Amino acid sequence: MVKYFLGQSVLRSSWDQVFAAFWQRYPNPYSKHVLTEDIVHREVTPDQKLLSRRLLTKTNRMPRWAERLFPANVAHSVYVLEDSIVDPQNQTMTTFTWNINHARLMVVEERCVYCVNSDNSGWTEIRREAWVSSSLFGVSRAVQEFGLARFKSNVTKTMKGFEYILAKLQGEAPSKTLVETAKEAKEKAKETALAATEKAKDLASKAATKKQQQQQQFV
């Protein structure tokens, strides 16, 4: 049984800009799990397509229950191969990625197609597919569920990283994420509530003092 993922995202930048950002997206604040990237092969075909292969080293900690199944000396780093085909004439880029170690535990294969958005030629559409499989007897389903959840989390980080690099390349200040904005709003609301509480205490204290003074006048 294989877990399948299908998703579609849109970047509000042109295909040329996204293509340029693709090769410059590491490092970024959302890719701390990506340790290294190396181009191991690159060529231009007779029909002017760019073929590339990169080796990425990532750190993805296993769940604790999975760590018990492997020796302590097993590397926690994951080596990922990425093949890409860029067709500048048709403005498409297709990438294929898969892990080459820890394959007994889990294999995650991903295919992405970057193309011009059909509704807005100044935007780029990303169609993403992934297949998560495991050959571990007895726990393969749990491993696949974990792998799919981790993959979805990494997709979110990938898109945030893309937006960050695109903003830098375009000379803009990277926009805050919704989570960061919500967190700041929550902190501000907490500060406002605290200030209001302190003010209320102060007013209550002054009122009590005034009342006490009035009572003393009638004694």
UniProtKB/Swiss-Prot annotation:
Transmembrane segments: none annotated. Highly expressed in fetal liver; less expressed in fetal brain, lung, and kidney. At the adult stage, expression is drastically reduced in the liver but highly expressed in the spleen, brain, lung, lymph nodes and peripheral blood leukocytes. InterPro entries: PRELI/MSF1_dom, Slowmo/Ups. Residues 36-174 form the PRELI/MSF1 domain. One of its GO terms (cellular component) is mitochondrion. Signal peptide: none annotated. One of its GO terms (biological process) is positive regulation of T cell apoptotic process. It catalyses: a 1,2-diacyl-sn-glycero-3-phosphate(in) = a 1,2-diacyl-sn-glycero-3-phosphate(out). The keyword Mitochondrion applies. It is found in: Mitochondrion; Mitochondrion intermembrane space. Induction: Up-regulated in response to activation in primary T helper cells. The keyword Manganese does not apply. Its main location: mitochondrion. It comes from the Eukaryota. Keywords: Apoptosis, Lipid transport, Mitochondrion, Transit peptide, Transport. Involved in the modulation of the mitochondrial apoptotic pathway by ensuring the accumulation of cardiolipin (CL) in mitochondrial membranes. In vitro, the TRIAP1:PRELID1 complex mediates the transfer of phosphatidic acid (PA) between liposomes and probably functions as a PA transporter across the mitochondrion intermembrane space to provide PA for CL synthesis in the inner membrane. Regulates the mitochondrial apoptotic pathway in primary Th cells. Regulates Th cell differentiation by down-regulating STAT6 thereby reducing IL-4-induced Th2 cell number. Forms a complex with TRIAP1 in the mitochondrion intermembrane space. Interacts with OPA1 and AIFM1. This is PRELI domain-containing protein 1, mitochondrial. The lineage of its organism: Eukaryota, Metazoa, Chordata, Craniata, Vertebrata. The gene is PRELID1.
